[in-house]
Amino acid sequence: MTEPDSKPKKGRAGRKKAEPVRPPEQFLELAELLDYVGQVIARGVPGGVWVRAEIASLTDRRHLYLDLVQAGEGGAGGVGEVAKCRATVWARERFALEAKFRGATSGATLSAGLKVLLFGTAEFHPQYGFSFNVLDISPEYTLGDAALRLEAMRAELVAEGSYGLNRLLPVPTDFARVAVIAPREAAGLGDFRREADPLEAAGLVEFHYLEATFQGREAGASLLRAVAAARELHQEKALDALFVIRGGGAVTDLAWLNDLELARALATFPAPVVTGLGHARDDTLPDEVACLRTDTPSKAAAYLVRTVVNAAAQAQEAARTIRAEAARVLVEAEAAAAWARDRALSSAVRRVDAAAAEVDALMRQALGLTPQRTLARGYALVRDAAGQPVTRAAGARAGEPLTLEWSDGSVPVRVE
């Protein structure tokens, strides 16, 4: 008899029942783990630190809730982000912090897209995760960062030769067809149209209004689309100018206009660009490349109206000058015609008188040459037998009878 195989048989009948695995006897509760992470962060980042980042988004609910990002080479907005976290500005710090920022930046407010330098503490909460509690801000960093980026863009435009192109165009001396880029229903646009609408109603200027966003991440792309639309209008029929206007705002709001592609589009625009962006002290890159800069939409409109009025006044003055010059030319022409007429008349009279005198002299001469007059002066007339005058010696032949005639009678003679 064969000994039974000591190895377990394959198949369901031959499987041994698995021994249950006992759970580890040592483990951490989730709260304990997260508490431990919080302690590590607290020990690793003691006290407050200055952190440089960009505000990706901001929510205002009495407290300010921010999403901070650090962008890599790909830029912000989810492309090329190398770090991201939540940050909070509690109400007790918020109002002092915002007042400080507004005071240093001429009224700017914290908004998405700003590069900021924040002072605060790192905190990790088991329920809410990591957060950066903001206690202070350095407005000078935000302004300095904007200035550095502006200088870099300016240098690039200068290097490629487009920076001063629009400023080389002649400053408009009159306006008949104008494109205007402005935010929709903005107060600045209303100020502009109060001055411009009467010109359009009078048929003096044709306006084309193009809407664009001047703040936020979409500002650059929106303004580029508006400039492209203005370029198409110019290709259809030449524009006298492109006005780019917006109402007043904080200095940092102007940073959205410091866009390289926008500045390049304005610098190379085929018609003069006039800006009125709401700030007298602070220039933007569009202000720098424009043919003409004004402070506000109202001043831009005033410039337009003043130019049209001056052109009309110059046209009226030119018309008056033309009328006066035409009248002067007519008077001089009439005087010249009268002088020429008098001169021609006097010349004709002199010629007629001279001709009459000459005729009279000829008549007297002719009358003085008649035979009777000649005979009366002592001459004698020789006639042949037929009674014809003999004027040459050859006509007197020998033996032929002739007659000598004087004024008082005649005597027959014969030639020997």
UniProtKB/Swiss-Prot annotation:
HAMAP family: Exonuc_7_L. NCBIfam families: xseA. It comes from the Bacteria. Bidirectionally degrades single-stranded DNA into large acid-insoluble oligonucleotides, which are then degraded further into small acid-soluble oligonucleotides. Heterooligomer composed of large and small subunits. Transmembrane segments: none annotated. Keywords: Cytoplasm, Exonuclease, Hydrolase, Nuclease. PANTHER family: EXODEOXYRIBONUCLEASE 7 LARGE SUBUNIT. Pfam families: Exonuc_VII_L, tRNA_anti_2. Belongs to the XseA family. It is found in: Cytoplasm. It catalyses: Exonucleolytic cleavage in either 5'- to 3'- or 3'- to 5'-direction to yield nucleoside 5'-phosphates. GO terms for biological process: DNA catabolic process. One of its GO terms (molecular function) is exodeoxyribonuclease VII activity. This is Exodeoxyribonuclease 7 large subunit. The keyword Repressor does not apply. The lineage of its organism: Bacteria, Thermotogati, Deinococcota, Deinococci, Deinococcales. GO terms for cellular component: cytoplasm; exodeoxyribonuclease VII complex.
